[in-house]
Amino acid sequence: MTESSFKLAIVVSQFNRAVTEKLLNGVLQRLTELDVQANQIKTVWVPGAVEIPLLAKRLAKSKHYQAIVCLGAVIRGETDHYNYVCQQVSYGCQQVALEYEVPIIFGVLTTTTKEQAFARAGGERGNKGADWADAAVSMIKLMKEIEITDE
């Protein structure tokens, strides 16, 4: 399977956009390095992290994409909201992957501080977006290798 034979989608949260734009740039830069063309990629923006699973489900249901990369940045605040958001988004993404058998790459940073988020979005810890792009391409290849045919 060549890199040019698939399509993937990227769902990006607008909340904490300064971080998520950097993550998106990391994904796109790595995909370019892997010779994935712009016409193979669809990027959609959602208001916040909680909305990611619904759009991921819609994209998976369309059967147009062989993987979906979900990007967000949830940064702990003073309330329990952080815990609920992190749990809902991770569970929702996993459910979509299992229901539609489409790799859903969980690219949602869950950090205690903004500094930690920026460190993982192109800062001293690198750009996790590149890792998630690699994971998407790897999973597309694995799913193709282990393709199940209807009998």
Swiss-Prot record:
KW Transferase (keyword) present: yes
GO molecular function, one term: 6,7-dimethyl-8-ribityllumazine synthase activity
Pfam families: DMRL_synthase (PF00885)
Substrates-to-products reaction catalysed: (2S)-2-hydroxy-3-oxobutyl phosphate + 5-amino-6-(D-ribitylamino)uracil = 6,7-dimethyl-8-(1-D-ribityl)lumazine + phosphate + 2 H2O + H(+)
Residues annotated as the enzyme's active site: H81 (proton donor)
Keyword match Transferase: yes
EC number(s) on file: 2.5.1.78
GO CC annotation: cytosol; riboflavin synthase complex
Gene3D superfamilies: Lumazine/riboflavin synthase
Pathway the protein contributes to: Cofactor biosynthesis; riboflavin biosynthesis; riboflavin from 2-hydroxy-3-oxobutyl phosphate and 5-amino-6-(D-ribitylamino)uracil: step 1/2
Chain sites annotated for binding (2S)-2-hydroxy-3-oxobutyl phosphate: E78, T79, R120
Gene Ontology annotations of biological process type: riboflavin biosynthetic process
SUPFAM superfamilies: Lumazine synthase (SSF52121)
Keywords: Riboflavin biosynthesis, Transferase
Family: Belongs to the DMRL synthase family.
Record function comment: Catalyzes the formation of 6,7-dimethyl-8-ribityllumazine by condensation of 5-amino-6-(D-ribitylamino)uracil with 3,4-dihydroxy-2-butanone 4-phosphate. This is the penultimate step in the biosynthesis of riboflavin.
Protein name: 6,7-dimethyl-8-ribityllumazine synthase
